[in-house]
Regions:
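Eukaryotic helix-grip
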Residues: 2-238
Length: 238
C-alpha cells in the first residue's frame, strides 16, 4: 500500500509553503525598496513634452520620492499670475484642486516681509483620509529680470493636529513668473511633495498631475478680478 499523507497534514504542508513564499516575497520587496532608495543620479531627466510644456524629474540617492520641474510659456500678465497666487479663497483653491473644501487664515498677508500662512483641507478618494495643508507662501520679486519667485513651504506645526485628516509635512513647491514682453510669461514650476501616498504610486502619477496643472494655468490666472489686485511690491520693482 502506498504511503499517504494524512489529511490533517496537507493543510500544514500548504501553510509551510505559503509562509515560506510570504517570507521570500517580503525579503524581495524589502531589498527592492532599499535598492530604490539608494538609487538615483541627482540629475534632471526630461520625461514629458506636450503642447509646449516640458516636464523633468530627478531622483536623489536616499530619497524614495522624485522631485519635478516644469517649464512653459503662457499668454498673461505678471499681475494676474501673482494675483492668482495670492488668492486664498476656497473657491480659488477648488479651481486648482477639485477636492479643496475649506480654508483658514493662519497668518494674514505681511506686506513688509511679503508672505502669508494659510490652511487648506482637501478631500481624498476613499479610503484615504482628507489632506491638510498648512503652507507659507513667500513672494520674492527680482528687480533685474522683473520676475517673481513664489515659494510654498509646509508649516505642519502651525495648528494642532486633527484626527480626521493627514497633515502634509513635506512640501517645497515653487513658481517663477518672468515677463517676456508681448503679453507672455515664462513659467517655471518645481514640486517636492510627500502627500502621504505610496511612493511608487506618486512617482508614476506625478508627471501627469504636473502637466495638468500647467495646461490649466492660463485659465486659472487669466481672470478679470486679478486685473484689479493692488500688489504694492510689483509697483515698487517695475
Amino acid at each position: 500500500m502506498r504511503n499517504q499523507i494524512p489529511a490533517a497534514g496537507k493543510p500544514r504542508k500548504f501553510f509551510r509553503f505559503f509562509l515560506g513564499g510570504c517570507i521570500a516575497l517580503a525579503v524581495l520587496l524589502t531589498g527592492a525598496h532599499f535598492a530604490w532608495k539608494a538609487s538615483g543620479t541627482g540629475e534632471w531627466k526630461l520625461v514629458m513634452q506636450k503642447e509646449g510644456v516640458n516636464i523633468y524629474e530627478r531622483k536623489q540617492p536616499g530619497d524614495t520620492l522624485k522631485t519635478y520641474r516644469a517649464e512653459t510659456r503662457i499668454k498673461s500678465t505678471l499681475a494676474r499670475a501673482v494675483g492668482a497666487m495670492m488668492d486664498r479663497t476656497v473657491e480659488a483653491c477648488a479651481e486648482w484642486n477639485a477636492g479643496c473644501v475649506s480654508g483658514q487664515e493662519v497668518e494674514p498677508w505681511n506686506e513688509h516681509e511679503r508672505y502669508y500662512i494659510h490652511y487648506f483641507r482637501m478631500n481624498s478618494p476613499a479610503p484615504m483620509a482628507p489632506r491638510e495643508f498648512l503652507l507659507r507662501a513667500q513672494f520674492t520679486p527680482d528687480a533685474d529680470d522683473k520676475s517673481v519667485f513664489i515659494q510654498y513651504t509646509a508649516m505642519p506645526d502651525k495648528l494642532p493636529l486633527n484626527d480626521c485628516c493627514h497633515r502634509v509635512t513635506r512640501m517645497n513647491n515653487s513658481w517663477k513668473f518672468t515677463p517676456l514682453g508681448d503679453g507672455e510669461l515664462d513659467v517655471e514650476f518645481y514640486q517636492d511633495l510627500d502627500a502621504g501616498i505610496p511612493y511608487f504610486v506618486y512617482n508614476l502619477a506625478a508627471p501627469g498631475f504636473v502637466y495638468d496643472g500647467l495646461a490649466l494655468l492660463p485659465k486659472l490666472v487669466n481672470k478679470e478680478k486679478y486685473d484689479h489686485e493692488r500688489i504694492s511690491f510689483l509697483a515698487a520693482t517695475h
